[in-house]
């Protein structure tokens, strides 16, 4: 059995850790509310660009834009994986990385070469440690993403898709050129509720033609295109619909990436809150167990001291009687 000093030292250590986990839990809780507010702020723009694209799609004479066209023999597929920049969020990163591995396995089985892109320091560390090749990584904004953060990745990904696997585009790090891709996929964590976050895979390009009946609320499929919706043209466009469609489609892809970043940020905070609450509860339980053990040790020490005193008194009494 551990000594009383050791037990008290462990109790102090557990209580110190509990303060950290409790603080992290409170911070994560507040960040979830902020993430929900950012989703609400981004929703009007996402809905309007989707509405305009729907009108443009119906007014366009031909939908032959590369972002809307299926490649006959796709050979390379870009995979953008969104992870967190910091840890202490339970299985958040491991789940999304596992889903990314499943996607890349599926792509290989289909005869496509996965081309990896990473967002978040944890994903960067994961693939670097395992010597897994990736084209580029963007870090430093997982908890508070901005539209410009999505734009940094979107510009390169759209350019790579436009040229296709037969063409080349400048490397995002400015270190030469790399081959293009025929598909764009994104792997992120969808925010379902405070207790549930699920890793999701979405294909960014080629884009499905229908752009209406979409839901942009957090916890729902932020960009689930309806295959049966019908769009009626209500506007006269200048310049023509084809030109506007070509200009807005990359912005639409950027909006989808940004929406995924916002959901991932909320999911990260929710996962961290759940993990830190569990850690705090475990710390409380462990501290209680250690305190009971310390009380037992202290009680045994007191009992032993009393026994020694009583034994000493009896010995003195016996000595006095003999005298």
Swiss-Prot record:
Pfam families: ATP-synt
Entry similarity comment: Belongs to the ATPase gamma chain family.
Gene: atpG
InterPro entries, sorted: ATP_synth_F1_ATPase_gsu, ATP_synth_F1_gsu
Function: Produces ATP from ADP in the presence of a proton gradient across the membrane. The gamma chain is believed to be important in regulating ATPase activity and the flow of protons through the CF(0) complex.
GO molecular function, one term: ATP binding
CDD domains: F1-ATPase_gamma
Gene3D superfamilies: 3.40.1380.10, ATP synthase, gamma subunit, helix hairpin domain
Species this chain originates from: Nocardia farcinica (strain IFM 10152)
Identification of the protein by name: ATP synthase gamma chain
């Amino acid at each position: 059995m551990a000594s009383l000093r050791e037990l008290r030292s462990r109790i102090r250590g557990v209580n110190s850790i509990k303060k950290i986990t409790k603080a992290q839990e409170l911070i994560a809780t507040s960040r979830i509310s902020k993430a929900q507010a950012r989703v609400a702020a981004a929703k009007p723009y996402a809905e309007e660009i989707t509405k305009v694209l729907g009108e443009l799609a119906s007014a366009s004479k031909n939908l032959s834009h590369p972002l809307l066209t299926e490649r006959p023999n796709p050979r390379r597929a870009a995979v953008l994986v969104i992870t967190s920049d910091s840890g202490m969020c339970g299985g958040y990163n491991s789940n999304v990385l596992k889903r990314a591995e499943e996607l890349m396995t599926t792509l290989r089985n289909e005869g496509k070469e996965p081309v990896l892109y990473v967002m978040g320091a944890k994903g960067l560390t994961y693939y670097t440690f395992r010597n897994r090749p990736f084209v580029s990584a963007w870090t430093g904004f997982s908890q508070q993403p901005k539209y410009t953060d999505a734009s940094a990745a979107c510009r390169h990904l759209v350019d790579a898709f436009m040229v296709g696997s037969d063409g080349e585009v400048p490397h995002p790090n400015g270190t030469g050129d790399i081959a293009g891709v025929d598909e764009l996929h994104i792997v992120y964590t969808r925010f379902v509720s405070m207790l549930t976050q699920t890793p999701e895979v979405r294909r960014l390009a080629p884009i499905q033609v229908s752009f209406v009946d979409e839901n942009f609320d957090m916890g729902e499929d932020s960009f689930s295109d309806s295959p049966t919706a019908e769009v009626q043209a209500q506007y006269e466009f200048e310049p023509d619909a084809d030109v506007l469609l070509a200009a807005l489609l990359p912005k639409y892809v950027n909006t989808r990436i940004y929406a995924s970043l916002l959901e991932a940020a909320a999911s990260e905070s929710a996962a961290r809150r759940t993990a830190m609450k569990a850690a705090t509860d475990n710390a409380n339980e462990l501290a209680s167990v250690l305190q009971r053990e310390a009380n037992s040790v202290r009680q045994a020490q007191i009992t032993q001291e009393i026994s020694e005193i009583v034994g000493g008194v009896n010995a003195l009494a016996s000595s006095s009687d003999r005298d």
